[in-house]
Amino acid sequence: MNKRKQKQISRILAAKRAEKCGQINAELQETGEYLEGRVHLLRAKLSINGINLKAYVLEQVINIKHQIVTERFGNVLLGLASGMIGGIIGMFMWVLCIL
């Protein structure tokens, strides 16, 4: 091969390498832009989920407060009912003891 052909081949190979590097750089840039977009979307989604999570936690706290009030009310009613039943039984026992 003569020197002219070798130079042409080396130029073609260099151009192909440069083109390949350019394609790789373009792909890297596109990938970077895509990832930045995804990160932005994920941050937005997390902030929305954070707001939803706060609302959910607040709702659960309110539900727990209602359950506690209901349980206390139920315990008070149960105590009153058992006291009344105990009083009635005590009265009958007292009456039976007198007879």
Swiss-Prot record:
Keywords: Host membrane, Membrane, Transmembrane, Transmembrane helix. The chain crosses the membrane at residues 76-96. The keyword Transmembrane helix applies. It is found in: Host membrane. It is a single-pass membrane protein. GO terms for cellular component: host cell membrane; membrane. This is Uncharacterized 11.1 kDa protein in rep-hol intergenic region. The lineage of its organism: Viruses, Duplodnaviria, Heunggongvirae, Uroviricota, Caudoviricetes.
